[in-house]
Amino acid sequence: MDAVHVRAPGKVNVFMRVGPLRHDGYHDVATAYQALSLYEDVRAYPADDISVTFAGGSVDTSALPTDGTNLAVKAAKLLAKRTGFTGGVRLEIDKRVPIAGGMGGGSADAAATLVACDALWGTELGREELLALAARLGADVPFALVGGTAIGTGRGDRLSPALATGQFHWVLAFAEGQLSTPTVYSELDRHRERHASEIPPAQRAPGVDAGVLQALRAGDAAMLAEVLSNDLQAPAIHLAPSIAEVLELGELNGALAGIVSGSGPTVAFLAADLDNALDVQIALSAARVRVVRATGPVHGARVLSD
């Protein structure tokens, strides 16, 4: 095989509850993921060793590592170790999902790499084995593999499918700068400690609200807008106050609701329909906010025929 092309989606967390800090430094979460039509493209070519380059796409990749710390390289090495494959791969990635933006772009790269290398190398691992490898790479990698709409528990990597009917329209606003996921979680812990007398304690076993599942099942954007929630939104805004301005701007210009995606700083605005999404996109663009429209749910990582 000369090359394999795999496309994997970014995601939005339409709901996210975060439990208290565990003794191992992690948090239990309960989240509702939706895969969006903002994709990462990974092309895998035969090679003697494992390497990655970035080409095309719409994201500045100049600061991204290309050594063994890159998540796509880690994915290829993990698959090679698991299967005993002794060759290599040259990975070429077109990035469209913002870096450190809360949309799982690096996770999409890793998921796409697992699928691409499995096909290129002929290792033919089953879906469950690929999911197990994905979970070892990061909490969001399994979802990038399966796509659609799903509930994530544990670190977010234990997935169960969630029925979502119809199509949801989103306008994604890319706030300036980047936010490190560990930094946002640490800020959440500090916020809870500072305001322990004012806010309810974190649920030790968080769950997704029934209203979220009902709205997704009904395919009702207005209903979903009422229940969008993210425990990481307040700490993300505290670290990057400009997020609050973007949220206000989108909602003033007709979005049903806005939510910080994951650990931010990307803000996802839910629109009533395509026309509403276009109106929000135009208004935010006029205010010099970088935006893109997307729909969901979409498929997870899969091989394309070029």
UniProtKB/Swiss-Prot annotation:
Coiled-coil ranges per UniProt: none
Active site: 11, 140
InterPro entries in UniProt: GHMP_kinase_C_dom, GHMP_kinase_C_sf, GHMP_kinase_N_dom, IspE, Ribosomal_Su5_D2-typ_SF, Ribsml_uS5_D2-typ_fold_subgr
Top-level lineage group: Bacteria
Pathway in which this enzyme or protein is active: Isoprenoid biosynthesis; isopentenyl diphosphate biosynthesis via DXP pathway; isopentenyl diphosphate from 1-deoxy-D-xylulose 5-phosphate: step 3/6
Positions bound to ATP: 98-108
Catalytic activity: 4-CDP-2-C-methyl-D-erythritol + ATP = 4-CDP-2-C-methyl-D-erythritol 2-phosphate + ADP + H(+)
Alphabetical GO biological process terms: isopentenyl diphosphate biosynthetic process, methylerythritol 4-phosphate pathway; terpenoid biosynthetic process
Keywords, alphabetical: ATP-binding, Isoprene biosynthesis, Kinase, Nucleotide-binding, Transferase
MF-aspect GO terms: 4-(cytidine 5'-diphospho)-2-C-methyl-D-erythritol kinase activity; ATP binding
Protein's job: Catalyzes the phosphorylation of the position 2 hydroxy group of 4-diphosphocytidyl-2C-methyl-D-erythritol.
Protein name, per record: 4-diphosphocytidyl-2-C-methyl-D-erythritol kinase
Organism from which the protein derives: Leifsonia xyli subsp. xyli (strain CTCB07)
